[in-house]
Design a protein with these regions (language model features):
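Active-site-proximal specificity loops/subdomain of glycosyltransferases
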Residues: 54-106
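N-terminal anchoring/stem segment of glycosyltransferases
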Residues: 1-77, 241-276
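Catalytic core and acceptor-binding pocket of nucleotide-sugar-dependent glycosyltransferases
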Residues: 161-245
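GT-A fold catalytic core of metal-dependent nucleotide-sugar glycosyltransferases
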Residues: 95-143
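Conserved catalytic core of nucleotide-sugar-dependent glycosyltransferases
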Residues: 125-187
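Edge beta-strands of extracellular beta-sandwich domains
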Residues: 324-325, 353-363
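Short, compositionally biased P/S/T/A/G/V-rich stretches that sit at domain boundaries
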Residues: 269-290, 298-300
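Short, aromatic- and glycine-rich surface loops/edge beta-strands on solvent-exposed regions
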Residues: 341-351
Length: 363
């Protein structure tokens, strides 16, 4: 990983997520010596900055006040770039603006692996390692083309389904600020945009298109939970995008990564869930380690000819009641702390608000 730099934007709210992301990547020896540059958005205090430096070896924090001064000089010849980064609403969606310019322009080696703080590397990222070693630029695959161009939308050509939560820019010839300027000439025309948080991603989708060398990571191994089925044994990287139902799953995946591999199975059962005169098999397995219970399921809707049907689990302990929503995901899991007393488990399908909670007999 010669001359690679990792760049990540961090804010106070997502500080722990950023640390989890880097730790999950650094479990792989290929990355554990790569320098990390944290770009702060002005929300971190001295204690936060010290925590980053102390927790992550070979890390540096680029403070906003320093970055603003340097980046302003870079963008002085590009009016749309300058307006986007420093305009009247410069503090709105600031994190996206920092990603657009600061990662690359403040890089020392110009070989940038850009990470969002809400990523988790759940297994060794073999594809990322290979592409970085081969100097091939890439981006994370999205479930849609989340862009926000103004009319006429087709005046700016783009690659489809670009997600910039994980990108690799291998060198100076792969970052073209003229392409970003061109995209922004549409995106912030008359200082109007209907979805400002997508501007940065839209601009990069155009830059990647104009470059012609950027490659999408394998969408079967790089997933967005809730919106996509996740096989945690086969997935390499997960992106917990800023959507409530996605973020609800985040802590379960962090716990899953910390769940001991030598855990033992304590429960296994298949029940039938009645829906629309059909009986849907629901397979459940439960594992335990010293501190946690791991519930894994298979929602066999396709076996009865159903393509999509949301479902939920509810866990009741003497201390709390928690609902886990899984959309139409056929495979999944959730992890809870082992309760001192009894535990009750319920399951239901969900169809346009209609539910039918049924208790599952448990140990």
């Amino acid at each position: 990983m010669e001359n690679i730099e990792i760049h990540m934007l961090v804010c106070k709210k997502d500080l722990s997520m950023g640390l989890n992301c880097i730790k999950s990547l650094f479990k792989n020896k290929e990355f554990d010596q790569v320098p990390v540059f944290f770009h702060e958005d002005g929300s971190l205090d001295a204690g936060d900055i010290e925590l980053l430096k102390k927790t992550i070896n070979n890390s540096f924090v680029i403070e906003k006040k320093y970055a603003d001064e340097i980046i302003r000089s870079y963008l002085s010849k590009y009016p749309f770039c300058e307006k986007y980064r420093f305009g009247k609403k410069s503090d709105i969606y600031l994190w996206h603006k920092i990603k657009t310019f600061d990662y690359f322009l403040l890089s020392k080696t110009k070989r940038v692996l850009g990470l969002d703080s809400d990523l988790l590397f759940v297994n060794k990222p073999e594809e990322v390692i290979h592409l970085v070693q081969e100097n091939i630029p890439f981006y994370f695959p999205d479930v849609q083309s989340a862009y926000s161009f103004n009319e006429p939308k087709n005046e700016i050509p783009v690659l489809e389904n670009v997600n910039t939560g994980l990108i690799f820019i291998p060198g100076e010839e792969y970052y073209n600020i003229e392409s970003i300027e061109n995209a922004l000439s549409n995106l912030i025309r008359d200082e109007i945009n209907y979805f400002p948080s997508w501007i940065e991603q839209s601009a990069f989708a155009h830059m990647f298109y104009m470059d012609g060398r950027y490659k999408s990571l394998n969408k079967s191994k790089n997933r967005i939970p809730f919106f996509q089925e996740v096989d945690i044994k086969k997935s390499e990287c997960l992106h917990f995008v800023s959507y409530p139902d996605v973020r609800k799953l985040y802590n379960s995946y962090v716990s899953k990564m910390n769940f001991k591999e030598n855990s033992k199975k304590i429960y296994e059962k298949t029940i039938e869930v009645e829906y629309d005169f059909k009986k849907i098999p629901l397979e459940i397995e439960t594992y335990e380690d010293d501190l946690f219970l791991n519930f894994e399921f298979k929602w066999c809707i396709e076996s009865v000819g159903i393509n999509a049907l949301s479902h939920q689990f509810k866990i009741k302990t003497p201390e709390e009641e928690t609902v886990y929503e899984f959309g139409s995901n056929k495979y999944g899991f959730f992890i809870i702390k082992k309760p001192v007393d009894k535990i009750e488990i319920y399951h239901t399908y969900e169809w346009y608000g209609k539910k039918d909670w049924r208790k599952i007999e448990f140990l």
